[in-house]
């Protein structure tokens, strides 16, 4: 994926602290862009989608709302959650296990397309 088209707000001028690919779910840690992950409560929650691929030291942009295709086998209307195992990606089910982040990142609108509009993250109790 080269660049991800935005359908809403884009925030630019963000320093990058870890390599990210276009379309990765990202958050901010220490004022810098990093991949988001739901493995434990202390991980970085997702704030948006990387607008392009960036290397450490780059300055990047985040799409806060975006429609992204290239998925397969999704069910329209189903929530897509921040992944607990693969940084920067989504999973179809809410994370299970005490202390993990549970964050809806967006919703499938077709078998191959997700509209991302990030919700606040909670911690699984």
What feature does the model see in each segment?
Residues 1-125:
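Glycine-anchored, exposed beta-strand/edge motif detector
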């Amino acid at each position: 994926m080269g660049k991800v088209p935005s359908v809403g707000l884009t925030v630019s001028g963000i320093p990058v602290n870890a390599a990210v690919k276009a379309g990765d779910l990202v958050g901010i840690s220490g004022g810098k862009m990093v991949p988001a992950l739901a493995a434990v409560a202390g991980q970085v929650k997702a704030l948006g989608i990387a607008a392009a691929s960036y290397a450490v030291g780059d300055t990047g942009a985040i799409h806060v709302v975006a429609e992204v295709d290239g998925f397969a086998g999704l069910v329209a209307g189903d929530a897509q959650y921040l992944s607990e195992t693969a940084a920067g990606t989504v999973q179809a089910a809410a994370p299970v296990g005490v202390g993990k982040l549970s964050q809806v990142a967006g919703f499938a609108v077709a078998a191959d397309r997700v509209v991302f509009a990030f919700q606040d993250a909670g911690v699984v109790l």
